[in-house]
């Protein structure tokens, strides 16, 4: 149904609309399938509302704001964009990331002041990192809490709590529900289910 002039437009309609509920139903009743496809087009509601004297408008958005996700490649691109925004937020708020491209922080994570995140760090879920911590490299914490001034390296932990001034790792495994008390050094190859490696 597009005209030649319409085909030359290099913008797209993302199909994201915000309507006043009391205006939408009457506008929908004015739609008709008078097109090559014989279908009702939601896009026609804009012209209907404008014809009824209502104010309508469009917002131009940057491409990353509106990119579609139809396959895993596009999902990876969208995740990269979101990760860059999240990392930028933390970098502007006093967190040091040695390599932001290799640092993964979920939206629900909370990070204190003067924290350093080394490459390969993944903080997921509702993880909370206290002030002055060093996390990583190659550390994954999910729904875990780390107290102030602790250093956690090459460690995996889920639903765990690490106290303040602790030294965990390298190569530590913290089982779900485990607690490392304040000031404890676990040593290398620590497994909270079996104790230190011998």
Please give the residue ranges for each predicted region.
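A eukaryote-biased feature capturing mid-to-C-terminal, repeat/solenoid-rich segments of large proteins
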Residues: 90-93
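Catalytic-core segments of class I nucleotidyltransferases/pyrophosphorylases
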Residues: 1-84, 88
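Structural signal for interior beta-strand "rungs" in well-ordered beta-sheet cores
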Residues: 96-198
């Amino acid at each position: 149904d597009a005209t030649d002039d319409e085909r030359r437009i290099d913008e797209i309609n993302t199909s994201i609309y915000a309507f006043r509920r009391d205006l939408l139903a009457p506008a929908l009743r004015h739609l008709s399938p008078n097109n090559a496809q014989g279908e009702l087009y939601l896009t026609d509601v804009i012209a209907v509302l404008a014809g009824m004297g209502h104010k309508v408008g469009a917002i131009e958005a940057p491409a990353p704001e509106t990119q579609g996700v139809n396959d895993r490649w596009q999902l990876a691109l969208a995740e990269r964009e979101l990760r860059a925004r999240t990392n930028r937020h933390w970098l502007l708020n006093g967190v040091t990331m040695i390599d932001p491209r290799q640092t993964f922080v979920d939206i629900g994570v909370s990070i204190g002041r003067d924290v350093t995140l080394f490459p390969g760090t993944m903080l997921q879920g509702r993880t909370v990192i206290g002030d002055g911590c060093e996390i990583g490299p190659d550390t994954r914490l999910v729904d875990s809490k780390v107290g102030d001034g602790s250093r956690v390296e090459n460690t995996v932990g889920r639903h765990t709590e690490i106290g303040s001034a602790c030294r965990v790792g390298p190569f530590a495994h913290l089982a779900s529900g485990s607690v490392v008390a304040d000031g404890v050094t676990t040593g290398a190859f620590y497994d909270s289910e079996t104790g230190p490696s011998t």
